[in-house]
Amino acid sequence: MERCTYRFARQSDLQTIRSELSHEAWNRLSELLEFSCTRPEWIILGFAAGALAGTLALATHTEFGIPLEVFEFHGGPKGRIDSLGMFHFAIEKARSLGSRELFYTVPEDSAETELISGAGFRHWRDVMRFESKGPADRGVQGYQSAEVSDFDRTEIIALIEQTSELSADCQIEFYRQRLGGMANAKMTLEVMEFTEYDPRWWRVAIAPSGRSIGIVLPVLAFGEPVIGFIGVKPECRGRKFASFLLTEAWKIMKLAGYSALYAEADQQNVSMHRALSASRFALQCRKQEWRLEL
């Protein structure tokens, strides 16, 4: 293995990085830069024999300011660079910026698990990523949606808390147990608010009686249009309300000019897989999420 050196990028390095990355990788990195999810000084460059051989980037939500995830954009030929050293370099940077935890995502069959485990990350959960190219007309008769802005903030936090009850998503359950239901709901809303979004995208499902029964929060997460949060009250589940909310979200996003919408679901959350499939979301890939507590 070549002796490696690492440093943080500068604005002047971006053209060099672009020339070294694949077209797909550069597009992803440029999206993170465009939406202020990363910045040049959060990009870690690894050099071997004087040549750029590896690139990592710390990223966060647009308005959050503290790194939440690590993205890898370039790996040199096998054995050329000490990737573990690069990860430690990135971790120390995140720690110095005040991060409490970091996430890293790899494909389901990734060979990187030993490396990221060596960097201190622990397997967090398995995730299924879905993609939709257009809404399905599966509205529930007699139900409507309203903008989240029509409700008091306390009402929205309470609705998120209620729709998170008995969740099959292990991440939601982890933070509910650690923080408590209402604190987790408040954190969820705050995280969504740190992303790029239009308040008109966020919808609450309303029953004929006027009672709110569910909520969906589409956002631009790391530059991509995704379902940031969706939930239905436990007593209303299994009656296509999730499909109704997904359809409402898609209508709004389509009007905003988006041609694709993504959603991610815990592999254990079978009911959400069904709702996504019923709403014409197709499985795109399976991933592993790893988490490091700092």
Please describe what each predicted stretch is.
Residues 108-125, 243, 267-285:
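Conserved active-site alpha-helix within GNAT-family acetyltransferase domains
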Residues 79-92, 232, 238-251, 255, ...:
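Conserved acetyl-CoA-binding loop-helix of GNAT-fold acetyltransferases
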